């Protein structure tokens, strides 16, 4: 792909700060790298229910894509639900469809068929993963369905690993009394936060060098301070300012 004249003038092969960051060149801070490793471990060890929360623009969806890429070659069979305005039985049908299993008419029948499917995957040595993005949109009833899915197990291991991804409102919903059983099943909760000021400098270097700068371009400390102050370390806001 030919670089835009603007980027080519700077010696870059592409836009280093696109509106949608690519998962292949994800920037890991030490705390995020630790959280990522723990999430991967929880899924591979079939521990069950993981929660990932953070404000809009902190890279949750990009991190999910990186996670799915990482797990793809490790015998993990995954379903990714992006339309969380589907509720109850419609949500279960979407989960079944994305896992490659025909939808059924009722929740009870769907859970029974899904259990059979997951047992077969488990016996084949595959890990089954359900990721629900924008999970703050789920109703209490749909989250109760998630709890039922959490209960599917062999006795020692969970048949379906679940990763709920959402904004902080999801934490508030899970704190409701009627969802205490679901909340108690969380084995790992990772909260994303904005970059610190020194991380903004490293993030700039990481993105600009990945686009071909090879150390020729840098950001002045005073500019990094202003960028951090204006964006609070929010990745989406950083990209909007620098694009």
Q: Model-found features: residue ranges?
A:
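A short, basic N-terminal segment
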Residues: 1-46
